[in-house]
């Protein structure tokens, strides 16, 4: 019996230094597969890249038109080029039962939750302010000024944790990843995502 439940969009956030990249890598190591969305960009196509696979390559004028038409769930400008995630990309994958994960900054996460109210939001929280400081300083790339900026920004972002559905403290990477996997598995079996399967079973 080939039955598919409704997919979901996962918003994955946390302050700089909370270890969210490491946690995400660990989740993938455990065999969790996420659907990849194809972003739109105005940068030039590089050798070996395929339009529609690596990116959707468009002109600046086309990109700005998409902004005007409210087609993006989020977009940014970096080094003179625009990058954005289309709402239609997420909707298409979720409708086919996929699990789309967007690792995104706190500010962007707020916009995504407004656009997709069924999105599952997870915030990775450091175990203490001291641990956060040590992780930021441990990178060895921070000047005193840049550290202060990143640390104060992180504190402001941590204050936004109540806006998320789930908050997971990253005191141990393996345990944190297991907790996130548990959240994802539980969310997959919520009635709103199982309804199609249930209806199909009942109507056979």
Outline where the language-model segments fall:
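Conserved phosphate-donor/acceptor-positioning beta-strand/loop module used by diverse small-molecule
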Residues: 100-105, 114-138, 170
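Conserved lysine of the Walker
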Residues: 20
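NTP-dependent small-molecule kinase module
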Residues: 3, 142, 156-204
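Post-Walker A helix-loop "phosphate-sensing" segment adjacent to the P-loop in P-loop NTPases
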Residues: 28-37
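Post-Walker A alpha-helix
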Residues: 23-24
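Extreme N-terminal, non-catalytic leader segments
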Residues: 1-9
């Amino acid at each position: 019996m080939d039955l598919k439940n409704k997919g979901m969009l996962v918003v994955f956030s946390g302050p700089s230094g909370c270890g969210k990249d490491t946690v995400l890598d660990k989740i993938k190591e455990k065999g969790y597969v996420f659907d990849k969305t194809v972003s739109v960009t105005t940068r030039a196509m590089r050798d070996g890249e395929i339009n529609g696979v690596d990116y959707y390559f468009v002109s600046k004028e086309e990109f700005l038109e998409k902004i005007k038409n409210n087609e993006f769930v989020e977009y940014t400008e970096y080094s003179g080029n625009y990058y954005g995630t289309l709402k239609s990309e997420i909707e298409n994958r979720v409708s086919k039962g996929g699990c789309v994960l967007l690792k995104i900054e706190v500010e962007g996460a707020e916009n995504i939750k407004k656009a997709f109210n069924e999105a599952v939001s997870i915030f990775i929280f450091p175990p203490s302010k001291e641990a956060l400081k040590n992780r930021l300083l441990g990178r060895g790339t921070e000047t005193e000024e840049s550290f202060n900026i990143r640390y104060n920004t992180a504190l402001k972002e941590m204050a936004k944790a109540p806006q998320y559905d789930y908050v997971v403290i990253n005191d141990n990477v393996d345990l944190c990843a297991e907790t996130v996997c548990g959240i994802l598995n539980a969310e997959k079996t919520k009635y709103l995502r199982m309804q199609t399967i249930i209806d199909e079973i009942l109507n056979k």
